[in-house]
Amino acid sequence: RNDALNAYKLPVEHLNGEGDGGMLQTFSSKALDGTGILGKKVEYVTGDTQTNADAARASARSMIEKDGAIMITGGSSSGVAVAVQSLCQDAGIIFMAGLTHSNDTTGKDKKANGFRHFFNSYMTGAALAPILADRYGADRKAYHLTADYNWGYTTEEAVRNSTEALGWETVAAVKTPLSQTDFSSYVAPVLNSGADVLILNHYGGNMVNSLTSAVEFGLRAAQANGKNFEIVVPLYSRLMAKGAGKNVAGIFGTTGWHWSLENTAGSRYTGTNAFVKSFGEKYGYPPSQAAHTCYCQALLYADAVQRGGSFNPCSVVEALEGFEFDGMGNGPTLYRAEDHQCIKDVLVVRGKENPANDFDLLELVDITPAEAVTFDPAIFGGNLGSCNPGA
């Protein structure tokens, strides 16, 4: 993801005292001062995961063994994140997850050396369900199409549980192959299924193709059970919204952050504008939520090293567990000790009817406060185990 890669170049500059400092200006922790980390200049190496767990593992292993990487970060799939996190645990390296939204990353597959700033499937369901019930009513029948992998399953489960708790009924849930590009055979049965809502537990190209197919089949214009037929996309990204074009207009989903957040929702989300300014001046366009979470993770790692006074992974773990911070664009945030999951507000968004440009595709509908998306860390199983300090 070029956007995420771009976002990693920025904190390296800011940590080394170059550029305008970005969110170092607004971050509640003042340990970092632009002289690197513990006086050492920050350098980085990159590798392509190919959205493939084996390729990602090989790339991360090479960075650790050949390049001497002491922290690995990134990835844009939960399968990749879980694989690389496990490798880092075994190697005694800290893993700061990038764009991964499956419950498993900080649930059944959590590791002491791994940390996630991005939100998860459970939080999406908890944030989205009340809005869906409010806008579409409690008497709805949902049909799920679910990408056949880790993230798809936890997202379907989360959205099903949270909507059923508010009165919705799930009439069908059908798995779709990750490699699927033509979804017409999956969309065709929906209208005669008794459902009046289609929920697309799809990400990236899957979502672009399935949503386009659903709209071409006339689902958005259809009636079912005496109601307007609706489509929901639980997790939005800018690239997906752009790829699906006008088909996203009016469709609800969630995101972890948006570049307009501070301007639309106020100073609680300070740090947003500082980051948008830094990123925009360097790259000529506003950052995505993927860029944001990656930038935050790099600074949070650096700050934890600085506060703990050591690059030892166990010192970093100690500094991050239970760390409360602010000024990084999400409002007050907790890095929870029990599962290494950041607990913060979640945005409910929908596609704009008349976007001004490719970066203005989503509008903020509501913000679900952190308290309302908080869950018992034990519910997803797993065990952090002990930190591995490495060599």
Specify the residue positions occupied by each region the protein language model found.
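Short, well-structured alpha-helical segments in soluble
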Residues: 46, 50-70, 130-135, 182-194, ...
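Short beta->alpha junction loops
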Residues: 31, 36, 45-53, 146, ...
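Signal peptide-proximal N-terminal region
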Residues: 6-44, 165-167
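Extracellular/periplasmic periplasmic-binding protein-like sensory domains
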Residues: 111, 214-295, 309-311, 362-390
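Extracytoplasmic "Venus flytrap"
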Residues: 1-17, 48-53, 76-77, 145-153, ...
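Extracytoplasmic ligand/sensor domains, especially the bilobed periplasmic-binding protein
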Residues: 6, 17, 66-174, 181, ...
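Solvent-exposed, acidic/polar segments of extracytosolic/periplasmic ligand-binding ectodomains
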Residues: 249, 324-391
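Short, charged, surface-exposed loops that flank catalytic or proteolytic processing sites
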Residues: 306-318
